[in-house]
Amino acid sequence: IDLRAGDYEARVATTGATLVHLRRAGRDLVIPFDAETTLPCGWQGRTLVPWPNRVAGARYTYGGEEYLVPCNEPETGSALHGLVGWSDFQVVSDTAGEDDPAGEADVDDVAEEAHEPLSDVTLELSLPASYGYPWALEVSVRFALDAVTGLTVTTTATNVGAAVAAPHVPGAPEAAGEALPAPYGVSAHPYLTRSVPLDECVLTVPAATVLDADPATMAPAGRRPVEGTDWDWREGRAVGETS
């Protein structure tokens, strides 16, 4: 799916709600790949739901119950980057033309009718409940290009209900007879580039705190101020200046 706005252009693949390339005035802003003929490098450009990073040991405890999720990184024994990275999302477009009565739209038809390129597209996926993650989610990822501000990606997930396990299956996601809220995290995995050596790039992150992770479980271990640490990027500095 190709998007354009001003000098910006992007391509999105439905598998994994993946950003395939992003360019401005012909210059790559992320490392591109050919989604039609090649597999990406790792999780390149993909949407990571319902967790980013690694679940150590491919197991986690939530609401007093332990759940096992598929291990897809054998070298670390971890469950990496969620459950939707290789799933095929459905396309919905609200850029041009009216919404399809069935809730889906053919992007090519919409663009042809509008006689102009698309500037945004929304991809949707229903993630069914499973034993390792017994919550059903409706996931929506919107990619929107603007001629001034560039690319905005908005990911929304709705918990449409926890699946109560059968009596012979332990670990039903219930507490005091009520379904627990779904544990959830989200991230994206683009590989940024500016056609210059990484160490020369200036990085600015307007964050006052950093989230530490437990080295054994990789679970969040609390936040701390970045001031006085190597994690303070608020003023912007060259990547090569940090250890």
Q: Language model features by range: what are they?
A:
Residues I1-P74:
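Beta-strand-rich N-terminal accessory domains
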Residues G6, G16, R54, L83-G85, ...:
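Residues that act as N-cap/strand-start positions at coil-to-secondary-structure junctions
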Residues Y8, S78-V92, T229-S243:
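Acidic/His-leaning functional-site neighborhoods
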Residues A10, L125-P167, G171, E178-Y184, ...:
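Acidic, contiguous internal or C-terminal segments within carbohydrate-active enzymes
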Residues G63, P70, P74, A79-L80, ...:
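Structured soluble/peripheral alpha/beta segments that form catalytic or ligand/cofactor-binding pockets
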Residues N72-D100, D108-V148:
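Extended, loop-rich substrate-binding clefts of extracytoplasmic carbohydrate-active enzymes
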Residues T95-L118, N159-L180, D212:
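Intrinsically disordered, low-complexity terminal tails and inter-domain linkers enriched
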Residues A163-H168, E174, A179, P183, ...:
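Active-site/ligand-binding surface loops and adjacent short beta/alpha elements
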